[in-house]
Amino acid sequence: MYQQQILIELQEAQQVLNDFINDQHNLKLIQEAALLITDSFKNGGKILSCGNGGSHCDAMHFAEELTGRYRENRPGYPAIAISDPSHLSCVSNDFGYEYVFSRYVEAIGQKGDILFCLSTSGNSKNVINAIIAAKAKGMKIIAMTGKDGGKIAELADIEIRVPHFRYADRIQEIHIKVIHILMMLIEFEMAK
């Protein structure tokens, strides 16, 4: 009944992954991001992560695997997803949704920390505001984007882009794969 559509979906997902892999620069950027994160951890820094919708879930997933575990039993790493419902509703109500992440960064971000942000469009205003706040604090920015990278591309210290223009879910599928690779590399590097 739907097997042909299922096959088409899987083949499209495979093509997006193949396109991403075939750009060797992406592999270099993933390694650079992992090393930047571990350098921050080794120097007392932390990760703040943010995104909207499915990207918000990916930001929480990344923080959870840093504080909890990925594949190895090891000490937790300092990471916070900007996802506290009372903070999000307070700032949305009092200042506007475009400030939900930046207010949190202003409150607890410090020099040496990293803002890990996700935006499939690269143009999410609240993520851009968080980047601006993080830069003002002396934080480094790792951004995972899609399409042409949007405005975020020029603001990030490291931008990992999935250049897919059709569906956000295809971009998010690569984002979560990259997050898992980052976790693997972080665990390798922190074990040294």
From Swiss-Prot:
Self-association state and partner proteins as the record states: Homotetramer.
Residues noted as binding Zn(2+) in the record, renumbered to the chain: 61, 65, 172, 180
Record's catalysed reaction(s): 2 D-sedoheptulose 7-phosphate = D-glycero-alpha-D-manno-heptose 7-phosphate + D-glycero-beta-D-manno-heptose 7-phosphate
Cofactor names: Zn(2+)
InterPro entries: GmhA/DiaA, Phosphoheptose_Isoase, SIS_dom, SIS_dom_sf, SIS_GmhA/DiaA_subfam
Residues binding substrate, per UniProt: 52-54, 65, 93-94, 119-121, 124, 172
Entry's Gene Ontology cellular component terms: cytoplasm
Comment field (misc): The reaction produces a racemic mixture of D-glycero-alpha-D-manno-heptose 7-phosphate and D-glycero-beta-D-manno-heptose 7-phosphate.
Origin: domain of life: Bacteria
Role played: Catalyzes the isomerization of sedoheptulose 7-phosphate in D-glycero-D-manno-heptose 7-phosphate.
Main subcellular location: cytoplasm
Protein name: Phosphoheptose isomerase
HAMAP family named in the record: GmhA
